[in-house]
Amino acid sequence: PEGMVGYEALIAATPPMADECGQDDELCGIYYTGGTTGHPKGVMLSHKNFIAASINWIATLHFSDQTRYMHSAGLFHLAGASPAFALTLAGGTHVCLPKFDAVLAFEAIQTHRVNYVLFVPTMINMMLNHPDFERYDLSSVRYCEYGASPIPDAVLAAAIAKLPSWEFIQGYGMTETAALTVSLPWRFHFDGEHGPHKRQAAGRAAYGVDVKIVDPDGRELPRGTPGEIAVRGAQVMLGYWNKPEATAAAIRDGWMHTGDGAWMDEDGFIYIVDRVKDMIISGGENIYSREVENAVHAHPAVRECAVIGVPDEKWGEAVMAVVALKAGQAVTEQELIAHCRT
């Protein structure tokens, strides 16, 4: 037709161009992470890493073209970037917050009928304790993935009670594995045909990922024995940018050594106890901060709690809890200590 250019004529008049699309082990992006060490390292992730991670999200976490996902994490972070790739592959809808704020989250969920969210435990706690929580309709949400830090038992119990339409899914991962590696589905948060609930667990290995617990020499440990989480699969990073020694220390014999201490039960569920380097050793005894944090957080006056080890002449290390109270609440140090002993 007049004024139109044919496809064949267009191709014939254009010189060939090299395919610039990245693939397989070609570098896709560098994401900086300090983990809990405080020293940023550039994690090199390939196109294959992101494709594998996206398939994992779709297979493990129910992403589909019906998903309306709210991004509460920055896209510079793998907690934001990894689901962004996966949701695009699935054909879902992106709802992006400019920053996390409880009211912004409430409004976005209500306005856009968001049905999938990802929050760190602190965000969940902030929402539950916000004075305007009851004013918003949050019932459109079906799935809430949570992770990045341990969630206190009291916070999870409150979330389940106050948000009955939400199905909570625990997710564990790291930048070096393109995010999700272990997942705890909703059904395992309760007793059922599978047996007693596994709410204390991070979950089992996600789709396409191998996970084991190893000793410092990389030998796999028996079930129930604490060690370090090691991960293998197509999601594992290429390495750290310009840090060959750090890469060699982290990836050994094809396994990514995470630095997270955990044990695995007979059913393959992973129970995280602490960062390997952050375990508190007092009088020769291993003390896991999460266990103490759960005990402190069970007190009704406590809003947030973090447990650390501090130098002690007698015991080597002593346990210290840093506590923030709920508005209008009061409790003494002695009362909290007595509570933890009960």
Located regions from the model:
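Active-site glycine-centered loops adjacent to acidic/histidine catalytic or metal-binding residues
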Residues: 148, 173, 203, 260, ...
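Conserved AMP-binding A3 loop
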Residues: 28-52
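Conserved AMP-binding/adenylation subdomain of ANL enzymes
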Residues: 51-68, 76-116, 130
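Gly/Ser/Thr-rich phosphate-binding loop
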Residues: 89, 114-119, 128-197, 210, ...
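Conserved pre-ATP/AMP-binding loop-to-beta segment of ANL
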Residues: 2, 13-32, 39, 62-68, ...
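AMP-binding/adenylate-forming catalytic core of the ANL superfamily
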Residues: 117, 233, 238-239, 249, ...
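Adenylate-forming
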Residues: 40-43, 53-58, 69, 106-108, ...
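Conserved ATP/PPi-binding loop(s) of AMP-dependent carboxylate-activating enzymes
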Residues: 204-208, 219-249, 285-287
